[in-house]
């Protein structure tokens, strides 16, 4: 099985590292890039969206929003699959 080329947009280094470790135990995974904010996530996607099979996106970033990243992915011709994360467990977010 070929590794899943994964792009991660997550502003917390601890969550990002734990997420990668957990996923690597479950599936063959190749993290192709990571971003911590909307601007750098969009910049990478503009140049490399075709280089990933899966995007894992945190909705609430310290700078910007994961929603803008998801909108940009929606506009790509070859869209990778997306997983949306949130560290907030409020009723509104659910």
State where each predicted segment sits.
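Negatively charged, flexible loop motifs adjacent to catalytic sites
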Residues: 62, 88-92
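Active-site residues of response regulator receiver
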Residues: 58-59
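Acidic, metal-coordinating helix/loop segments flanking the phosphotransfer/catalytic sites
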Residues: 34-54
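Short amphipathic alpha-helix used as the core "switch/output" element in two-component signaling
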Residues: 67-79
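Conserved acidic carboxylate
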Residues: 10
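Acidic catalytic/metal-coordinating carboxylates
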Residues: 37, 63-68
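Two-component/phosphorelay signaling modules centered on CheY-like receiver
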Residues: 13-33
């Amino acid at each position: 099985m070929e590794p899943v080329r994964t792009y991660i947009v997550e502003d917390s280094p601890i969550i990002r590292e734990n997420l990668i470790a957990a996923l690597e135990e479950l599936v063959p995974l190749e993290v192709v890039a990571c971003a911590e904010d909307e601007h750098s996530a969009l910049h990478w996607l503009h140049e490399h969206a075709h280089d990933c099979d899966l995007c894992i996106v945190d909705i609430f970033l310290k700078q910007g929003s994961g929603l803008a990243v998801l909108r940009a992915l929606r506009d790509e011709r070859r869209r990778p699959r997306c997983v949306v994360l949130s560290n907030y467990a409020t009723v509104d977010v659910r």
